[in-house]
Design a protein with these regions (language model features):
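Sterically constrained small-residue positions within well-ordered secondary structures
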Residues: 19, 29-31, 240, 332-333
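Residues in and immediately flanking transmembrane alpha helices
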Residues: 18-19, 78, 282
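Short alpha-helical segments used as structural interaction elements across diverse proteins
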Residues: 2-3, 62, 257
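Sec-dependent N-terminal signal peptides of Gram-positive bacterial secreted proteins and lipoproteins
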Residues: 3-27
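Domain-terminus/edge residues, biased toward the C-terminal soluble/receptor-binding domains
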Residues: 150-155, 166-391
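Active-site-adjacent loops and short helices of periplasmic peptidoglycan-processing enzymes
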Residues: 24-173, 177-186
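Structural motif marking the loop-to-transmembrane transition
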Residues: 4-8, 60, 111, 366, ...
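Hydrophobic alpha-helical segments, especially transmembrane helices
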Residues: 6-7, 66, 242
């Protein structure tokens, strides 16, 4: 029987603040759904737009792998593993149940080669082999999964790297945050968008692979994962880019495969029709050049300490204002020293991100001060040398 569910849209936060994001009620929207829980997030801002039973933990089967994928790409980014690393398939990995590409125990493949079946068709044997390579064993990898969850401020608990274990319990909101973090890695979408492919084994035999996410046939969608068991129901994580943002729908425990995709489409369709995303500042990006008093240089650049993006309701863009607040700069200054902030004001509230100077600025010496005074008197720029006048 269909249950009428309501969600509340939430706006305006900085993406790096997860645990203490400001929440402003904008409107309520009703959906007819049979899912146990769902969540809708904008990945750039880490803003939960919609959620029903979002904090309740469930066994979400294959969606557990979202954390495994995140750790794979973080290990690659940190240089802990390399894409060309040789990964040996253990007996434990080869005998994993559920979806697989039927890897043979004792065979070896590159890390990159196994990423494709792990992501594209949620192959449990490939995921386990990669997890063992990253951490030495699946048990050690699970410890990394739980540690990373705590770092992200999440309450989920993992018992395995694949989601086969019913003791892996996650909430829709937690999965939304994990999926948003994973979406930073373009390498993931390289494989999550493949519909059909073939895996060639070390022996030369081939296994046909297919993606269970039917929505990727539509160019709007680019992944992310699915999962199902008789007891947990049908779950999905679906991603789409639009309007400067990336919207991700998490559906847990729906009654059948078509229902999970229908709800995901409705959630993302609502987000695309209603919201836009605007990036105000990029982490490390220069925001402005400001004068410095009593320094060995006359100006210094200031940069944003974090990314700053806002989620806004379409039609309200004109009501968003940006204000740079910086005190008068006086030397000495240290590179990275916070000297002000960018403040964004919108109808729903106010957010800000710190600004820091991009170089050391020493106090000017008597000589440098006299030289600067002389240059000003002669009308010279910072880089002009005094001209020699012929006798």
């Amino acid at each position: 029987m269909n249950k009428s569910r309501k969600f509340v849209s939430i706006l305006l936060t900085v993406f790096f603040v997860v645990a203490a994001m400001p929440m402003v009620t904008v409107r309520a929207q009703e959906f007819e759904t049979t899912a146990k829980a769902y969540a809708l997030i904008e990945a750039n801002t880490r803003q939960i737009i919609a959620s029903e039973n979002g904090e309740e933990k469930f066994h979400a089967a294959g969606l557990t792998k979202l954390m495994s994928y995140l750790l794979f790409f973080e290990a690659l980014a940190d240089g802990k593993v390399r894409s060309e690393d040789s990964v040996r398939v253990s007996q434990e990995a080869a005998k994993k149940g559920g979806t697989s590409v039927f890897l043979d125990s004792g065979t070896s493949y590159s890390f990159e080669t196994l990423l494709k079946p792990a992501i594209m068709c949620n192959a449990n044997d490939a995921v386990t082999a990669l997890a063992e390579h990253v951490a030495g064993s699946e048990a050690a990898f699970v410890e990394l999964m739980n540690a990373r969850a705590k770092e992200l401020g999440l309450s989920c608990t993992f018992a395995d790297c694949t989601g086969i274990s019913s003791e892996s319990l996650v909430s829709a909101n937690d999965l939304a945050v994990i999926a948003a973090e994973l979406s930073k890695y373009s390498g993931f979408f390289k494989y999550s968008t493949i519909w059909l492919d073939t895996f060639t084994h070390e022996s030369g035999r081939e296994t046909e692979m297919s993606n269970s996410n039917v929505l990727i046939k539509n160019d709007l969608y680019d992944g992310m994962s699915t999962g199902s068991t008789p007891s947990s129901g049908y779950s999905a994580a679906i991603s789409a880019k639009s309007g400067g943002g990336r919207f991700i729908a998490i559906v847990i425990g729906d009654k059948d495969t078509s229902s999970r995709f229908k709800l995901a489409e409705e959630l993302i369709g609502y987000a695309i029709a209603t919201f836009g995303v605007k990036q105000i500042a990029q982490q490390g990006g220069k925001v402005k050049t400001l004068p410095v008093a009593n320094g060995d240089v006359e100006e210094v650049g200031v940069y944003a300490k974090e990314d700053l993006s806002i989620l806004y309701k379409k039609g309200e863009e004109g009501s968003i204002s940006t204000n740079i607040q910086v005190d008068e700069l006086t030397a000495p200054l240290q590179k990275g020293q916070i000297v002000g902030k960018i403040v964004i004001t919108a109808p729903e509230g106010e957010i800000s991100v710190a600004l820091a100077v991009d170089q050391d600025v020493k106090e000017q010496s008597f000589g440098s001060g006299w030289h600067r005074l002389l240059r000003g008197f002669l009308g010279l720029t910072e880089y002009e040398e005094p001209k020699t006048v012929a006798p």
